[in-house]
Amino acid sequence: MYDHLSELAQRLGMHMARSCKNGLRGHFDDDLLDDFSGETKKSIGMALAELEGDGLVTLSHVLGPHLPRVRTTWRLFVACDPAITGHDPVEDSVVLARLLIEKPDLGGHAKRLEDVAGWSRRRFNPAFALLVPHIADGRTRKPIQNDYPVMGFVLADEDLVALQRYVRDHS
């Protein structure tokens, strides 16, 4: 993870990334107090603020609960997955981008691309999510579901050029 973060922030980040079994962004709340019962509410709150400062989580402060509501970001998987799964989501996203450049029709359905990659959903989703910002918004299939970051893409030439640049910049 990031060495400049406190030891508690690193443990919290790893815990949350491990808890996201399907590789999708997760939601956490006061259960973190139970999961880290040896820590104070203040120390956990400070560690969460560190994670938020690095863009690894977003925090929503609400009345009542002891801790803010926590939502992990894709950057958390990028930071933690090499240690958790042994796979780097950035390197994996380059593999997926190359598959999409070679066969753009694979982008239509995330499930089809996942099958061709041959990866577990836990490995696939963070890598796939890293490609979403490089596809024009109107060509991204976004129905509400809990399987993938998006259901797929309808790739146009501009998107393929963006993916080629992504591969160039991340290889």
List PLM regions with ranges.
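Short, amphipathic alpha-helical interaction segments positioned at domain boundaries
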Residues: 74-99, 153-171
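Minor-groove-contacting beta-hairpin "wing" of winged helix-turn-helix DNA-binding domains
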Residues: 64-72, 143-155
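Leucine-rich, amphipathic alpha-helical/linker segments
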Residues: 89-117
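Winged-helix-like regulatory helical subdomains adjacent to P-loop NTPase cores
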Residues: 1-16, 73
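A short, conserved structural fragment
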Residues: 52-63, 132-147
